[in-house]
Amino acid sequence: MLNKLTHGVFTYRASLTAMLSSSTSAGLSSSFVSSRFLSSGIFSSGASRNRVTFPVQFHRASAVRCFASSGGSDRIQVQNPIVEMDGDEMTRVIWSMIKEKLILPYLDLDIKYFDLGILNRDATDDKVTVESAEAALKYNVAIKCATITPDEGRVKEFGLKSMWRSPNGTIRNILDGTVFREPIMCSNIPRLVPGWEKPICIGRHAFGDQYRATDTVIKGPGKLKMVFVPEDGNAPVELDVYDFKGPGVALAMYNVDESIRAFAESSMAMALTKKWPLYLSTKNTILKKYDGRFKDIFQEVYEANWKQKFEEHSIWYEHRLIDDMVAYAVKSEGGYVWACKNYDGDVQSDLLAQGFGSLGLMTSVLLSADGKTLESEAAHGTVTRHFRLHQKGQETSTNSIASIFAWTRGLEHRAKLDKNEKLMDFVKKLESSCVNTVETGKMTKDLALLIHGPKVSRDLFLNTEEFIDAVASKLKTQFKELPLV
């Protein structure tokens, strides 16, 4: 079945079962990954905990054309590839289930597979992350499973060679895009802000500011200065910052016009796609030059490239002070795109997630400045606590909705780029199947807790696989004309 193996890339045509087998660590079968962690010994205690030996070449990338064993003609044809980025822990387990039960039975799909599991990132010195992002730029659509960002504890747990950077940060830097988060609305899930009748899509400028700042502890009295030394040989620019009378702290941060402009372009592209108004929030009344630069560049980009397009769809762009925007957000009904600076977006996106109900009901997409390349993923992490239960063979009730929507939002972008109406119809059916499943009372424990309170009984929620099966059943009723594998 293996036709070609060159520099860590292999291509083969496979049945549905073979495809699922290819999408797991070390060439292991999907059943091994989803149900044999406990018995395999891979996750046993000891110095080699969570270490597994595997041939690295099988993890760098694979190009897989997937179709049903009965033939691809009865599946929806997807003309161009998508990049799949596999992940870690409980989300990796449900990722395999989603592919097996909700995606592959319906789509004839060319998948460029990259294993971003922590073990493979370690084995490839994190090159696999860079390669996956470069593939995303090439094929314009990437769908990512949640991944571990290692801290000191994780380095020890997995025996890692290094404390590797966040895969999301690496991918963001290469794609040079903006992260947009948006809630998934279910009518029976209570919202902490009941007035939010429509989604709010929040865009975070994930570059610079506090996240690339230089900070220091000042140990005693003295003058703090900031100096800029031009490369053209002109005289340095020296600014007095503060005359310390005693100990304190200091911070220097920056941003660049190129990144701010890309942020503006991708924010406006998202707003136009959704046909929603766009708001940028800053504190330019205090940071007149720093935040003022954001305000000025957004206005320039809007006037030059977007104003006419926005007006044709009766939408608009507006700058607001961050405090005014937060107040507006709480009292609004939703239905707009909110462009935030880096720190504001970090904070406000979690506020929106809880306000709408749950991080488990939040999508996350990274959109490039030109609007052409999109990477989608769940907004939550790898659900470690549930994975520990899964390792012990105990029942879990893990919410897979955000991971399912990671697939649908990526496939939706593929459908738009390819003008593939059948694929777009599939996306709508799968998303509605998820929402309808919850709205008919079938849900995981985290959502049942929101409805029924902390003493929710076992009969009011489904376990991890039962929920995915319930969604699959809903989807099946919408595709009765298509035989299932």
Swiss-Prot record:
> Under which EC number(s) is this enzyme classified?
1.1.1.42
Q: Which GO terms describe its biological process?
A: isocitrate metabolic process; tricarboxylic acid cycle
Looking at the record's lineage, which domain of life comes first? Eukaryota
Q: Where is this site: Critical for catalysis?
A: 211, 283
Q: Give the UniProt subcellular location, in the record's own words.
A: Plastid, Chloroplast; Mitochondrion
**A GO molecular function held by the record:** isocitrate dehydrogenase (NADP+) activity
Record key words, sorted: Chloroplast, Magnesium, Manganese, Metal-binding, Mitochondrion, NADP, Oxidoreductase, Plastid, Stress response, Transit peptide, Tricarboxylic acid cycle
Which residues are the signal sequence here? Answer: none
Gene3D superfamilies recorded: Isopropylmalate Dehydrogenase
Q: Where does substrate bind?
A: 149, 166-172, 181, 204
Using the UniProt entry, state which stretch of residues is the transit peptide: 1-65
- What is the uppermost EC class here? oxidoreductase
Cofactor: how and how many bound: Binds 1 Mg(2+) or Mn(2+) ion per subunit.
Q: Which cofactor does it need?
A: Mg(2+); Mn(2+)
Q: Which reaction does it catalyse?
A: D-threo-isocitrate + NADP(+) = 2-oxoglutarate + CO2 + NADPH
Q: Does the keyword Manganese apply?
A: yes
Q: What is any Pfam family matched here?
A: Iso_dh
GO cellular component term, pick one? plastid
Which sites bind Mn(2+)?
323, 346
State its role. Answer: May be involved in response to oxidative stresses.
Q: Which family does it belong to?
A: Belongs to the isocitrate and isopropylmalate dehydrogenases family.
- Its name, as the record gives it, is Isocitrate dehydrogenase [NADP], chloroplastic/mitochondrial
